[in-house]
Every structure is written in C-alpha cells, then in structure tokens.
A protein has these predicted regions:
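Generic structural hydrophobic/aromatic packing signal, biased to beta-strands
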Residues: 23-25, 50, 66, 103, ...
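Short N-terminal secondary-structure initiator segments
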Residues: 17-19, 44-45, 51, 88-92
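Charge/polar-rich, low-complexity and marginally structured segments
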Residues: 2-13, 71-189
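Compact, well-ordered interaction domains used in eukaryotic information-processing assemblies
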Residues: 29-72
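N-terminal, Lys/Arg-enriched amphipathic/low-complexity engagement segments
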Residues: 1-31, 35
C-alpha cells in the first residue's frame, strides 16, 4: 500500500526543522540553557550554526537573524519561476535546498505580515500566484517524466525529496495501470 503524501511531507518537514542553518548574531547574548541543551554564547556579528527551530526562536527574540541564503523571498521565487518557464518539459531544474519547507514558511510569514499591514497583502498574493505557477510547472514535468520510460538517476537528482516521492508513486501507479490495460487475456479468464 502506498505511503500517504502527508506522512512523507511531514517527515521531510520534521527533518528540515531539525537541520542546521546559519545565522548571524544581532547582539551579544550569554549562553542559554534549555533542558539538556546549551546554546551560545553569542557575539554580535559572528556567524553560528543551529537547528532551524532554535534559529527561529533566536530570530523572534531579536538575538540573531538568518543568513540571506537561508531565506526564501519573493525575489528568489521570481527567479525560480522564470527558470521553470524557460525549461523544456523533459528537464527539471535544481531547487534550493529544503525548498518546500522554506516556501511554506515564507508564505506563512507573508500572510502574517499582510494581516498586520494591509499594504503587504499584494506581495503575499503575488507570491502565492508565483508559488502556484512554480508548483504547477514542476508537477507537469513530474507527471510527464513518471509516465515515460524509467528515468536515469541523472534526471532524478534535481528532484526534491517531496517530488521524488511523488514521482515514484506516480511511476508505479502508471506502470501498473498500463500493464493492466495492455495485458492480453482471454475473456472469462
């Protein structure tokens, strides 16, 4: 039986939240002790690496900020959208690492900003539209590749974990369907 998509995406998201990210200290801060975990001390301007969930809390507290390359923003989304549009159906480009978890968080942040400042609503709506375009473009490519003969690892290496899971499920389903349709059996067998 196929593994539910929500379990796969949840698993990828769990791994992302616990993956190491880089951040820069905004100010000096002594060592912080949590249950079984010590973080810091932090010196203003220095770069540190912590699990994403800790970095997120440090950012909320104003102690640190994410490095620019750790973030996904509207400008990066537009570049990705452009890249997806100019490529052929048989080729899928490499997305930034942890693209979908970062995308979900980017959209959540924009939505929260829009709820507090109505002038941000337009940016949120544009980002949402661009995101939908990226997802639809990649989905078309995944479906096309999944219905073609098996792909080489070279082709599949640009898939994200979420996309590879979808590709494998679709490929298996399409292959089984084709086999059933094209199977030559006598009536009544």
């Amino acid at each position: 039986m196929a593994k539910p998509v929500s379990i796969n995406i949840g698993s990828v998201d769990f791994n992302f939240v616990h993956s190491l990210v880089k951040l820069i200290a905004n100010r000096n801060c002594p060592e912080i002790t949590l249950v079984g975990l010590n973080i810091g001390p932090f010196e203003e301007g220095n770069e540190y690496e912590t699990p994403f969930w800790i970095a997120q809390e440090l950012e909320k507290a104003g102690i640190a900020r994410f490095r620019e390359e750790e973030r996904l923003d509207t400008t990066k989304l537009y570049k990705i959208q452009w890249t997806e549009r100019v490529q052929t159906v048989g080729y899928i480009s490499k997305l930034p690492e942890n693209f979908y978890p970062k995308l979900r968080r980017c959209l959540t942040e924009l939505k929260e900003e829009a709820s507090k400042a109505p002038e941000k609503l337009r940016e949120y709506e544009k980002s949402r539209h661009v995101t939908q375009d990226i997802v639809n473009s990649r989905l078309k490519k995944i479906v096309s590749l999944a219905s073609a003969p098996p792909q080489t690892e070279q082709t599949l290496k640009n898939f994200t974990n979420e996309e590879r899971f979808l590709y494998e499920q679709l490929n298996k389903l399409i292959h089984e369907w084709k086999t059933q349709i094209l199977e030559c059996k006598e009536a009544g067998e």
